[in-house]
């Protein structure tokens, strides 16, 4: 493999909180947590859990973004990671099950949309909450759309560096060539239990330092 790509989760990874969970906590029926519990128990798929949860959110985009602007901040040294990727021609994609318009909003504040791709379900606000349109799988055998994107890049000769924090990230992280998990996160615990090599990090300087040999 002669090229590397970075795929990173957004909520609780690039930013300091789970922005989607914040929206659910503040603007959705509390029963969304029952759906989340079903996913964690392995009774429904990652995509189905997100689809059902977001359908419970009763607030337009501008209301959600106004609330998030007061509480969201970037994890330390993410600015430097973006610059590191730009200078070294290292493709960077946010792969997230979060609300796509929130990701676009915070990246656009920094002018990063020209450098960073977003791979996430499109969310449309309706009278029945948010309706999602997930990316079409490249390989129907994939566990979820994040896992699918890792395999897509690998099949095209790229080495995949994955960064995340949640259980929904685990299939992608397990498949990736190099993986980082936010320290103490569900992903870090899952990798430890699965005996999968994973660097636990608290900020993005550690990612920059460990990926210097992967550029180009």
Tell me the role of every PLM-derived stretch.
Residues 1, 17, 43-49, 65-70, ...:
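Short acidic/polar alpha-helix capping motifs at helix-coil junctions
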Residues 1-52:
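Active-site neighborhood of HAD-like aspartate-dependent phosphohydrolases
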Residues 7-9, 95, 163:
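Short hydrophobic segments within beta-strands
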Residues 31-37, 62, 113-115:
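Short, surface-exposed acidic
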Residues 35, 49, 64, 204-207:
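Hydrophobic/aromatic residues in well-formed alpha-helices
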Residues 47-83, 88-90:
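Metal-dependent phosphoesterase signature
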Residues 77-91, 98-216:
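C-terminal cap/substrate-recognition subdomain and adjoining C-terminal extension
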């Amino acid at each position: 493999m002669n090229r590397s790509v970075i795929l990173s989760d957004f909520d609780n990874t690039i930013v300091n909180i789970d922005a989607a969970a914040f929206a659910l906590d503040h603007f959705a029926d509390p029963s969304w947590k029952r759906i989340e519990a079903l996913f964690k128990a392995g009774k429904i798929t990652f995509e189905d859990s997100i689809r059902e949860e977001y359908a419970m959110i009763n607030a337009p985009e501008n209301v959600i973004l106004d609330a998030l602007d007061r509480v969201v901040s970037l994890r330390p040294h993410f600015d430097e990671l973006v610059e590191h990727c730009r200078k070294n021609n290292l493709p960077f994609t946010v792969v997230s099950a979060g609300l796509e318009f929130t990701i676009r909003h915070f990246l656009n504040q920094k002018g990063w949309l020209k450098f960073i791709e977003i791979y996430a379900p499109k969310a449309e606000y309706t009278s029945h909450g948010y309706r999602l349109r997930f990316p079409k799988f490249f390989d129907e055998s994939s566990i979820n759309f994040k896992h699918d994107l890792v395999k897509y890049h690998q099949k095209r000769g790229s080495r995949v560096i994955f960064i995340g924090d949640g259980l929904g990230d685990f299939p992608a992280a397990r498949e990736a060539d190099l993986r980082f998990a936010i320290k103490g996160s569900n992903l870090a615990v899952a990798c430890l239990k699965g005996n999968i090599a994973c660097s636990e990090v608290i900020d993005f300087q550690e990612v920059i330092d460990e990926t210097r040999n992967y550029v180009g």
